[in-house]
A protein has these predicted regions:
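Alpha/beta catalytic cores of nucleotide-metabolism and tRNA/nucleoside-modifying enzymes
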Residues: 2, 9-26, 30-152
Length: 152
Protein backbone atom coordinates (compact mmCIF):
# COMPACT_ATOMS: atom_id res chain seq x y z
CA UNK A 1 0.00 0.00 0.00
CA UNK A 2 2.67 2.53 1.00
CA UNK A 3 6.26 2.32 -0.13
CA UNK A 4 9.44 4.07 0.83
CA UNK A 5 10.36 5.75 4.06
CA UNK A 6 9.93 9.29 5.31
CA UNK A 7 13.03 11.45 4.86
CA UNK A 8 13.39 12.96 8.29
CA UNK A 9 16.73 14.57 7.39
CA UNK A 10 14.80 17.13 5.32
CA UNK A 11 12.54 17.84 8.27
CA UNK A 12 15.64 18.32 10.45
CA UNK A 13 17.14 20.75 7.92
CA UNK A 14 13.98 22.85 7.94
CA UNK A 15 13.85 22.82 11.74
CA UNK A 16 17.50 23.88 12.02
CA UNK A 17 17.22 26.67 9.44
CA UNK A 18 17.81 29.92 11.39
CA UNK A 19 15.51 31.84 9.03
CA UNK A 20 12.49 29.72 9.91
CA UNK A 21 10.59 30.72 13.05
CA UNK A 22 7.46 28.61 12.94
CA UNK A 23 6.71 25.34 14.72
CA UNK A 24 7.81 22.35 12.68
CA UNK A 25 5.66 19.23 12.82
CA UNK A 26 7.34 16.03 11.69
CA UNK A 27 5.31 13.39 9.92
CA UNK A 28 6.06 9.94 8.55
CA UNK A 29 6.80 6.47 9.85
CA UNK A 30 6.03 7.21 13.51
CA UNK A 31 4.53 3.93 14.72
CA UNK A 32 5.86 3.59 18.28
CA UNK A 33 6.51 5.81 21.29
CA UNK A 34 10.23 5.19 20.82
CA UNK A 35 10.12 6.51 17.26
CA UNK A 36 8.27 9.63 18.42
CA UNK A 37 10.91 10.29 21.07
CA UNK A 38 13.68 9.80 18.52
CA UNK A 39 12.02 12.35 16.22
CA UNK A 40 12.02 14.94 18.99
CA UNK A 41 15.58 14.21 20.06
CA UNK A 42 17.29 13.74 16.70
CA UNK A 43 15.42 16.27 14.56
CA UNK A 44 14.23 18.77 17.17
CA UNK A 45 10.67 18.90 15.86
CA UNK A 46 8.07 20.76 17.87
CA UNK A 47 5.48 18.04 17.39
CA UNK A 48 4.92 14.79 15.54
CA UNK A 49 1.92 13.83 13.45
CA UNK A 50 0.73 10.25 13.62
CA UNK A 51 -1.00 8.75 10.59
CA UNK A 52 -1.35 5.09 9.65
CA UNK A 53 -0.23 3.90 13.08
CA UNK A 54 -3.58 5.07 14.45
CA UNK A 55 -5.52 2.60 12.31
CA UNK A 56 -7.16 0.28 14.81
CA UNK A 57 -4.92 1.67 17.51
CA UNK A 58 -6.39 4.93 18.82
CA UNK A 59 -4.57 4.46 22.12
CA UNK A 60 -1.19 5.17 20.47
CA UNK A 61 -1.47 8.84 21.48
CA UNK A 62 -1.74 7.90 25.15
CA UNK A 63 1.16 5.44 24.80
CA UNK A 64 3.35 8.13 23.25
CA UNK A 65 2.41 10.75 25.85
CA UNK A 66 3.09 8.38 28.74
CA UNK A 67 6.42 7.33 27.23
CA UNK A 68 7.55 10.90 26.60
CA UNK A 69 6.44 12.02 30.05
CA UNK A 70 8.15 8.97 31.57
CA UNK A 71 5.12 8.31 33.75
CA UNK A 72 5.59 4.57 33.90
CA UNK A 73 1.89 4.23 33.19
CA UNK A 74 0.46 0.76 33.08
CA UNK A 75 -0.29 -0.35 29.51
CA UNK A 76 -3.96 -0.59 28.64
CA UNK A 77 -5.62 -3.94 29.11
CA UNK A 78 -7.30 -5.82 26.27
CA UNK A 79 -10.68 -4.77 27.68
CA UNK A 80 -9.66 -1.10 27.71
CA UNK A 81 -8.37 -1.31 24.15
CA UNK A 82 -11.52 -2.96 22.85
CA UNK A 83 -13.60 -0.41 24.78
CA UNK A 84 -11.71 2.31 22.90
CA UNK A 85 -12.36 0.60 19.57
CA UNK A 86 -16.07 0.43 20.43
CA UNK A 87 -16.01 4.11 21.41
CA UNK A 88 -14.32 4.97 18.11
CA UNK A 89 -17.12 3.12 16.28
CA UNK A 90 -19.81 4.92 18.29
CA UNK A 91 -18.25 8.35 17.69
CA UNK A 92 -17.90 7.77 13.95
CA UNK A 93 -21.50 6.63 13.64
CA UNK A 94 -22.74 9.63 15.67
CA UNK A 95 -20.53 12.05 13.73
CA UNK A 96 -21.57 10.88 10.27
CA UNK A 97 -24.31 8.26 10.09
CA UNK A 98 -24.43 4.51 10.63
CA UNK A 99 -23.68 3.49 7.06
CA UNK A 100 -20.69 5.78 6.45
CA UNK A 101 -19.48 5.58 10.05
CA UNK A 102 -19.26 1.80 9.75
CA UNK A 103 -17.56 1.99 6.34
CA UNK A 104 -14.93 4.27 7.84
CA UNK A 105 -14.45 2.33 11.07
CA UNK A 106 -14.52 -1.31 10.03
CA UNK A 107 -11.27 -1.16 8.04
CA UNK A 108 -9.53 0.39 11.04
CA UNK A 109 -10.88 -2.34 13.30
CA UNK A 110 -9.77 -5.07 10.90
CA UNK A 111 -6.26 -3.57 10.85
CA UNK A 112 -5.92 -3.39 14.63
CA UNK A 113 -2.78 -5.07 15.96
CA UNK A 114 -4.69 -6.12 19.06
CA UNK A 115 -6.07 -9.08 17.12
CA UNK A 116 -2.69 -10.52 16.15
CA UNK A 117 -2.24 -13.93 17.62
CA UNK A 118 -5.89 -14.94 17.51
CA UNK A 119 -5.95 -18.33 15.80
CA UNK A 120 -7.86 -18.51 12.52
CA UNK A 121 -8.67 -14.79 12.63
CA UNK A 122 -9.01 -14.45 8.85
CA UNK A 123 -12.74 -15.19 8.77
CA UNK A 124 -13.37 -12.81 11.66
CA UNK A 125 -11.45 -10.05 9.84
CA UNK A 126 -13.53 -10.69 6.71
CA UNK A 127 -16.71 -10.49 8.81
CA UNK A 128 -15.52 -7.14 10.22
CA UNK A 129 -14.94 -5.80 6.73
CA UNK A 130 -18.40 -6.93 5.60
CA UNK A 131 -20.36 -5.75 8.65
CA UNK A 132 -23.11 -3.25 7.90
CA UNK A 133 -24.56 -2.49 11.34
CA UNK A 134 -23.25 -1.34 14.69
CA UNK A 135 -24.72 -4.47 16.25
CA UNK A 136 -22.72 -6.71 13.89
CA UNK A 137 -19.45 -4.93 14.63
CA UNK A 138 -19.96 -4.79 18.39
CA UNK A 139 -20.87 -8.49 18.34
CA UNK A 140 -17.65 -9.27 16.48
CA UNK A 141 -15.66 -7.17 18.95
CA UNK A 142 -17.31 -9.03 21.84
CA UNK A 143 -16.29 -12.34 20.26
CA UNK A 144 -12.74 -11.04 19.75
CA UNK A 145 -12.54 -9.94 23.39
CA UNK A 146 -13.45 -13.46 24.50
CA UNK A 147 -11.03 -15.10 22.07
CA UNK A 148 -8.13 -12.90 23.19
CA UNK A 149 -8.84 -13.64 26.85
CA UNK A 150 -8.92 -17.36 26.08
CA UNK A 151 -5.36 -17.29 24.68
CA UNK A 152 -3.82 -15.00 27.32
Amino acid sequence: MYTGEADWSLIGEVKNNPRIHIPIIGNGDITTPEEAKLAFERYGVDAVMIGRATFGRPWIFEEIRDYLDNTGATPLTVDEKIDLLEEQLRINVERIDEYRGILHTRRHLAASPIFKGIPDFRQTRIAMLRATTVEELTGILKECRERIKAIE
